[in-house]
Each structure stands twice: as structure tokens, then as C-alpha cells.
Amino acid sequence: MKVLFVCKGNAERSMAAEALFNKLSKRNKASSAGYDVIGEKGEGKGPSEITSKLFEERGHDVSAHKRRHLTERMVRDADIVVLVASGDESRILPKWLIESGKTRVWTVHGNEHTREHHAARLEIIGGLVKDLVNEIG
């Protein structure tokens, strides 16, 4: 089964979910993308610095991650799409993402850029990923 995690910039939430899912799941594969990967947060850049450091402290190397812009094909190719949202993104999301029939929404509030807030979001995402792995393998 292919799981696609999506967030705005593919620098923290969706990237973290992808890395944790791929570490925990033995049968399934995850990837991630952002629906607004443009400008200085552009495609091909790595994860946020704080996120990289937090993962490194936990024994995970995410330095090879490169931000990717979400495409309709990515959604078509996925069996499950998980939007790791920070709030009400529904008004700015592509229609084809919402109407795919594959999309689940995990709301992980907060856009603060402190180490403590990043760590708290990673803990929440980690719990949600564990639940998904327990559900699908």
C-alpha cells in the first residue's frame, strides 16, 4: 500500500510523517509532498533545520529529504493520502486532492517555530503515524 503525506511546505509535518511511517511499517511505503512548495521554501530544499536536529537527536537521518510539490499524479498513485494540516486549509487545497476519496485529515495545530513547538508537533505526528501503521501494517 502506498501512503502519501501532504502538508503546506513539505518541510516538517508531512516529511516527519513519511520518515516515521517508513521506519515503522514493514509492508507499506510512504512518500510526502507539499501543496505550496514555492519561493524560498522551494522544491528540492531539505527539511527545516529544527526538524532535522530533532530527528538527529532521536537517531533518524532525514538529511536526504528534498521538498516536493504535490501533483495530481501523486494523489492518483497513492492508496491513502493523509493531509497533515495546521488548521483550516480546505479553502486553498486543490479540488482534486479533496475529491480524491482517499484523503484523511490529521490536524496538528501550531505554526510556531520554536524547538519546543516543533518537538510537540513531532510527538503528535508520531502517535498518529503509529495508529496508521497499526491499522494498515
Regions found by a protein language model. Name each.
Residues 1-5, 75-76, 126-134:
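N-terminal/domain-start segments enriched in small and hydrophobic, helix-friendly residues
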Residues 1-71:
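Conserved active-site segments centered on acidic
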Residues 25-29, 77, 99-102:
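Short glycine/proline-enriched coil/turn segments at helix->beta-strand junctions
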Residues 32, 83, 104-107:
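Structural signal for conserved beta-strand scaffold positions within catalytic alpha/beta enzyme cores
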Residues 49, 73-76, 116-123:
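Generic alpha-helical secondary structure signal
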Residues 65-96:
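Mid-chain, well-packed structural core segment of small domains
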Residues 89-137:
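Phosphate-binding/catalytic loops
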